[in-house]
Amino acid sequence: VREAIRDSCNIFFYEAGYRLGVDNIEKYAKEFGIGQRTGLEISESSGYLATKADKVQIRTYSTSDYIRRTVGIKGNAIITNEDGTEQAVYKSYAIAKELYSQITPDKYEYNSISQLYNRIFEEVTAIMAKYNVKDNVYLQKITQQIMDSRWVTTDTINASIGQGGNSTTPIQMANFLSSLVNGGIRREPYLVEKA
């Protein structure tokens, strides 16, 4: 591990990340403070830690935008959030949320990508028929958006080396390295005027 860190050996970390899996990468990154505010007394960004849930959320927004701008579904709707609160949203977002809550590519068993695509296309077609959307071009684009929401091996490998959707602040990285060299003890950082 020391040599891999010293040499910045991506291949070592690709393999380590692949073996760990994204859920463990997320768990350990959070333990080291990645993707969250550090507690400094100045305003700061929390950075961003790429996760399966965030990838689906990003695709939900993208699909909502496509439904509103290209398919042409306008207006507002009320959705109920996971915590039970109601929220006013674009109707297109409510439809996208419905699509992504009912169609989860990871739950299907399939022998080929085309088999998975066809299965999702059928479900998209059924849901969008409720909104009078029957144009194959629209249905195919929405199906592809859902296909693209799958977390795949390359996402895990990218996450393992801090690439992809990850974004950290310099203070998060300094705090991470400090924790690493101090045997995993994470301290809250603070600013000093003079050393």
Language-model-derived ranges and their functions:
Residues 1-195:
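Beta-lactam-recognizing serine transpeptidase/beta-lactamase-like catalytic domain environment
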